[in-house]
């Protein structure tokens, strides 16, 4: 581990998955329900997410509306506790969340998070929606777009996992090639 000139640990480069929940971790056949009655997370989708994390060593950053209930210290919201337990069953956990002024400015939140965390070497967005500011911030190039949970083949699919892995691991190819 490298040290800063002050003796602290230097931040390691990391990979990040900006994760939406609805339309990514569930589909119309989802029987799992959060305590509020909202659609829960499908095990098959969580297995694919786990595969992405295992093959890339990426961290999960929530961009979903679910994030309003997540706290780094202690979460008491029943829906968030449900999600955290489901993730934990698959060896996954939430690293952080984005903050934006309005739900339609999801790209702004991602951009702000990346600006505040300069140790990110690669990132991908798993989302079933494209927000107006995605193009403005260059997020569309990192977007792996799933289908909304009422559409056919909704949520995270094998091809999405492969695409996300390729995006996250492309930085290793660039580093190996001296770029």
Go through the PLM ranges and name each one.
Residues 81-179:
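C-terminal cap/substrate-recognition subdomain and adjoining C-terminal extension
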Residues 26-28, 69-73, 132-136, 153:
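Short catalytic/ligand-binding loop motif for oxyanion handling, primarily in non-cytosolic enzymes
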Residues 39-42, 69-73, 101-104:
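Acidic-and-aromatic substrate-binding clefts and catalytic sites of carbohydrate-active enzymes
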Residues 18-31, 64-67, 127-129, 148:
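Short loop/turn segments at strand-loop or loop-helix junctions that form parts
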Residues 53-79:
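Substrate-recognition element of Asp-dependent hydrolases with the DxDx(T/V) motif
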Residues 16, 59, 122-124:
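Structural motif
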Residues 2-13:
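Short, Lys/Arg-enriched N-terminal segments with co-localized hydrophobic residues
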Residues 12-57:
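Active-site neighborhood of HAD-like aspartate-dependent phosphohydrolases
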